[in-house]
Each structure stands twice: as structure tokens, then as C-alpha cells.
Amino acid sequence: MNIEDKIPDLVWTKELNCGITVCDGYGNIIYMNDKAILLKHGNLTGKNIFECHNPDSCRIIRHLLETGGQHIYTIEKNGIHKLLYQSAWKEKGIIQGLCEIMVELSEPIPHFIR
């Protein structure tokens, strides 16, 4: 059973114009939306997130899974700037895994003070 069957409300993320990857508390990828599959060059569902990252990234991911925290940063890859938001996801206050949202950024990014 895939996560969309378990959580029918997740269906709205399937065609969202940002990459969404979700893993369980052991780092097993349990969901990728269409954009994440495209950005990662294939469906990694069933693979372990720790096999896809370097040791520094794995350390950060483990920390997020232990503390329930978040990590926000930008990268540039092949000339494309991306914002990455990683956050532990919880159920009834208990950490269940990690969610990563990847957004391709336009140049320049408007910044407003409100």
C-alpha cells in the first residue's frame, strides 16, 4: 500500500509545482510527488534517503529525525537555484519521518518587508 492510499488527502500534492519527498523515521522514502520524481531523475520510493546523501547531509537528517526540527537552505545545481525545506513530520506529537519540499527559484527573488 502506498502513502496515497493511507492518506487520501495527500492526492493534491501529486501535481503540485514543487518537489515533495517524504520518508519514514528510518529514512525509507515512502512518497514522492511527480515534480520530485522529475527533479530526482526517477522514482526513489522504497529507497533509503541516507543512500542518496553525503555524510554531512545524513548527519543533518538524523538530527532532524531525532529532534523534530527543520532545515532550510538554498542550492544551485546546473545553474538552477532551489530552495529546500526539510522538516520532521509528526503524528500525535511523535516524529514519524521527514518531509522535504524543493522549489525551483526564479531570478531574482522578490523580497518584501511587511
Regions found by a protein language model. Give the residues of each.
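Sensory modules in modular signal-transduction proteins
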Residues: 1-34
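Sensory/regulatory domains in signal-transduction proteins
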Residues: 26, 31, 35-114
